[in-house]
């Protein structure tokens, strides 16, 4: 038995953070253990550095930036693993899908080792931000052309996500409707899959959550190859 990892993805400013926090609060009100992790995370050195680059406060090469984001995601593997062991619903506001979509927009291939594949992904679909910033206030990647390229990359990436692990929601829908859809589906995913012991890594290895020792916390020892993990076959994942 373990918790689940839920990703909320999409281009900039389509309501991801709003929906992620609303989901966390709604789950807590229903007595579920829930936590929301934002990427980039401003409370970490790496996340703060990434945000400074995105806000054009400091400069960094595109390759360095994308590799730094992937490193940033991998920094949370131990924390996410512990939360799953403790039966939390872990909500990530952006995750590896963003890393891939944004890196591909710059023609860069990134390393994805030591990163989980989300159990379920909500993709808020929109080619452009719902509220455009003035040009002088735009972050890196927030030009219309760049966001459209990133959206195209997202659609390609989402096509490779198993359909029983993905919900595509038009970002222009009423916020209450989006929230209800995300909350209802998240609860169903959690309740129907609480018997799972493993979570898939991006390199198709598995972390045995039940074997994780919260005393010494050497999660690397719990990584296993893909050897007949029938209980975690994508076709058997229930929604």
Swiss-Prot record:
SUPFAM superfamilies: P-loop containing nucleoside triphosphate hydrolases. The gene is TMK. Keywords: ATP-binding, Kinase, Nucleotide biosynthesis, Nucleotide-binding, Transferase. This is Thymidylate kinase. Pfam families: Thymidylate_kin (PF02223). The keyword DNA-binding does not apply. GO terms for molecular function: ATP binding; dTMP kinase activity. Its EC number is 2.7.4.9. ATP binds at residues 10-17. Catalyzes the conversion of dTMP to dTDP. Belongs to the thymidylate kinase family. It catalyses: dTMP + ATP = dTDP + ADP. One of its GO terms (biological process) is dTTP biosynthetic process. Pathway: Pyrimidine metabolism; dTTP biosynthesis.
């Amino acid at each position: 038995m373990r918790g689940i990892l839920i990703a909320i993805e999409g281009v900039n400013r389509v309501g991801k953070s709003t929906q992620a926090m609303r989901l966390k609060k709604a789950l807590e009100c229903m007595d579920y253990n829930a936590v929301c992790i934002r990427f980039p995370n401003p409370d970490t050195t790496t996340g703060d550095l990434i945000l400074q680059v995105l806000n054009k406060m400091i400069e960094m090469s595109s390759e360095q930036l994308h590799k730094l984001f992937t490193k940033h995601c991998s920094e949370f593997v131990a924390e996410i693993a512990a939360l799953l062991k403790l039966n939390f619903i872990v909500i990530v506001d952006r995750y590896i899908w963003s890393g891939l979509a944004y890196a591909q927009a710059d023609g860069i291939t990134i390393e994805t080792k030591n990163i989980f594949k989300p159990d379920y992904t909500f993709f808020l679909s929109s080619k452009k931000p719902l509220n455009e910033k003035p040009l002088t206030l735009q972050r890196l990647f927030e030009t219309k052309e760049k966001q459209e390229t990133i959206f195209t990359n997202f659609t390609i990436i989402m096509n490779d996500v198993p359909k029983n692990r993905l919900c595509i929601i038009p970002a222009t829908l009423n916020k209450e409707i989006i929230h209800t859809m995300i909350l209802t589906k998240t609860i169903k995913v959690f309740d129907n899959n609480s018997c799972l012991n493993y979570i898939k890594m991006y390199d198709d290895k598995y972390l045995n959550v039940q074997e994780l020792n919260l005393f010494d916390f050497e999660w690397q020892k719990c990584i296993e190859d893909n050897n007949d993990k029938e209980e975690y076959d994508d076709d058997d994942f229930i929604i």
